[in-house]
Design a protein with these regions (language model features):
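Secretory targeting and sorting signals
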Residues: 1-29
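N-terminal capping segment at the start of a domain
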Residues: 30-67, 122, 192, 196-199, ...
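Extracytoplasmic/secreted proteins, especially bacterial periplasmic and envelope-associated proteins
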Residues: 34, 43-46, 50, 67-87, ...
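A non-catalytic alpha/beta surface segment that caps or lines the substrate-entry region
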Residues: 49, 53-107
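Solvent-exposed loop/turn segments at secondary-structure junctions
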Residues: 57-58, 86, 93-97, 108-111, ...
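Alpha-helical metal-binding/catalytic segments enriched in His/Glu/Asp
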Residues: 117, 121-170, 286
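Metal-dependent peptidase/peptidase-like ectodomains
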Residues: 163-261
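His/Asp/Glu-rich mid-to-C-terminal helical/loop segments that flank catalytic regions of hydrolases
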Residues: 262-300
């Protein structure tokens, strides 16, 4: 979560009502959409432990331009390569240092209708960034690996991204979007962003509402997923994380956050700053909505 943001609505939402994280049966499934797999804590928390270890052996952080960030990218890329994704590193330079965005494409689906999902992988220099944003990165990685494990055959093309240099000001995602052709921008039906997916003080899931493009199908899908499980949500606008880069380019966006944690941008944003149940719920929500959107008829 970039330090540039001012999110009074987000902070206020964290003061909302309490919730119960136990699973609640979902509504009757659409027979056209394959059932989304369940996610266990054991399928997502090991990624956070790995990111913590990377920070521990690299001066306590995984910031842009550091060995800790490079090792974080290598860890995620290795897992995706083994799972059968087509991965590529997209380099950029900021503040005299080279960084990489990691892009992973799942074979198949309509290349003219891309469903893109992402999270920033860098931390600030002051800490390991395990909730901000190891939690979002781990949830997106676990989702991608579920796609591979189940052999999902989507109607839309699935693309995943892990962004660099979000903390200094959305640099990596802005560089990526800025270099897309007009045709490639039009091919992205929606971009889903996840920043802080495991906050311990979560009261509501904060669903991104793209005001410029109206209520997107993705926002509706997230709100429906949470409502079916009696999980409170709160709408927030586009801004403050990498979805802003896509919104500025006219690309619809959604996603969610679990709110600003008690420790952010400090050394205490370590593994103890993530609630495993919240992280699991977030990952299951991403999986559930991605499965639905991947199987639906593209809008344009």
């Amino acid at each position: 979560m970039t330090s540039r943001r001012s999110l009074p609505r987000l902070a206020a939402a964290v003061l909302g009502v309490s919730l119960t994280l136990s699973a609640v049966p979902a509504a009757t499934a659409d027979p056209r959409i394959p059932a989304a797999p369940t996610v266990s804590e054991q399928q997502v928390m090991p990624h956070l432990r790995a990111l913590q270890r990377i920070a521990d052996r690299n001066g306590g952080n995984r910031a842009h331009g550091t060995k800790g960030y490079a090792e974080s990218v290598a860890y995620v890329k290795r897992a995706l390569d083994r799972a059968g994704f087509r991965t590529r590193l997209v380099p950029f330079t900021h503040d005299g240092a080279t960084g990489n965005n990691l892009i992973a494409d799942w074979p198949g689906g309509d290349p003219d209708h891309v469903l893109m999902t992402g999270a920033h992988l860098d931390s600030v220099k002051e800490g390991p960034g395990i909730n901000d944003n190891g939690s979002g990165s781990a949830a997106v990685l676990a989702t991608a690996l579920q796609v591979a494990r189940t052999g999902l055959k989507p109607e839309r093309h699935l693309r995943f991204a892990w962004w660099g240099a979000e903390e200094p000001g959305l640099i990596g995602s802005a560089e990526y979007v800025g270099k897309l052709s007009a045709a490639d921008r039009r091919r992205i039906d929606v971009y889903l962003n996840f920043d802080q997916a495991g906050s311990r003080n979560t009261r509501q899931w904060l669903v991104i509402h793209d005001d410029e493009h109206g209520e997107t199908e993705a926002q509706q899908a997230f709100e429906a997923w949470f409502a079916e499980r009696s999980v409170p949500t709160f709408d927030i606008g586009v801004g403050g994380s990498d979805h802003e880069s896509f919104g500025n380019a006219g690309i619809p966006s959604s996603g969610f956050s679990t709110g600003i944690s008690d420790c952010i941008h400090e050394a205490c944003d370590d593994l103890s700053n993530v609630d495993p149940k919240t992280e699991r719920t977030s990952t299951e929500a991403i999986v559930g909505v991605l499965w639905k959107l991947a199987a639906t008829t593209p809008r344009h």
